[in-house]
Amino acid sequence: MELQTPKNGVIGTDMPVRDAALKVTGQFKYVGDMTLPHMLHAKVLFSPVAHARIKSIDTSQAEQLEGVRAVVCWKNAPDALFNSCGEEIDGEKTERVFDSTVRYVGDKVAAVAADTAKIAEQALKLIRVEYEELPYYLEPEDALKEGAYPIHKDSNVIEEVVQEAGDVEKGMAEADYIYEDDFETPAIHHGAIETHTSLAVYESSGKLTVYTPSQDVFGHRTNLSRIFGLPMSRVRVVNPGIGGGFGGKIDMVTEPVTALLAMKTGRPVRLVYTRREDIPSSRNRHSMKLHLKTGMKKDGTIVAQEMDVIVNAGAYAGGTMSIVWAMSGKYFKNHKTPN
């Protein structure tokens, strides 16, 4: 297929999508299609419990399996805390590459790099983990109760935002009718056709390159630099193309794992989540609970509105702060509301 180059500038001209022909004919190489010489395949061991301390983890049998080149867990991973969402990179830092505490079913416990994906999967079955289960919460209201067990060391509240305009109390007093109702939105997985995947290369010169369908290559680059203590000049993040993101690939998911394994082995490492791995073990759209109170005149004029929102961050902060700030203001753009 030959693409036609626009002849009369940009405005009012149909612009060709340069990679469209490759994609519709199945020739485009996504990260999951990429291979490099001596490349290893990675698989991740996920937590079967919602919240627990890892009392012990024995990877010795997995390490001895023929074809296994590295096994990583919290014991031999960087201890640096980070926020996986580039928008909040200097915000609340709650994650590690691997942690001695798991905080949701599907949290990362360990990872293996092996000559084949099949060998890596076999190695996962040889890892022995003992968990000390801790309290967990399925509803955000329970996590907010006094005396609730902290999912992280400080508090179960990541951020509280209050925005005001006008005089809500006065507006409600002037209203002819007051309506109150509760609303709830579910957590939704972004469901991109391409699952989370990455391929990391660590050169003997100390340069780290990560290929990933990221929606935030610069945020990923900064995070990887900080996690592994590398100068920014030694870290490169490349997005060769993305098979759908919809916001779900703003956060880092597989990239720190492949980077760590590549640094341990000195060989390229690729990790491709299956669909069954991707949905429980990556990021979802936040679920929310909203209470809305609206004061109105008889002619339908809105004179005051008040909204309380609880945003469910799940196990880690990620981009929650941006969502909280957005929810505290965006709704009131729908209607002219003086208070």
Specify the residue positions occupied by each region the protein language model found.
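Solvent-exposed alpha-helices and their adjacent loops that cap or buttress functional pockets
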Residues: 16, 34-38, 94-96, 101-106, ...
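Alpha-helical support elements that line or immediately flank enzyme active sites
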Residues: 44-74, 110-130, 198-265, 311, ...
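Glycine-rich loop/linker segments at domain edges
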Residues: 13, 19-25, 87-88, 159-198, ...
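Flexible, low-hydrophobicity surface segments
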Residues: 1-157, 178-181, 264
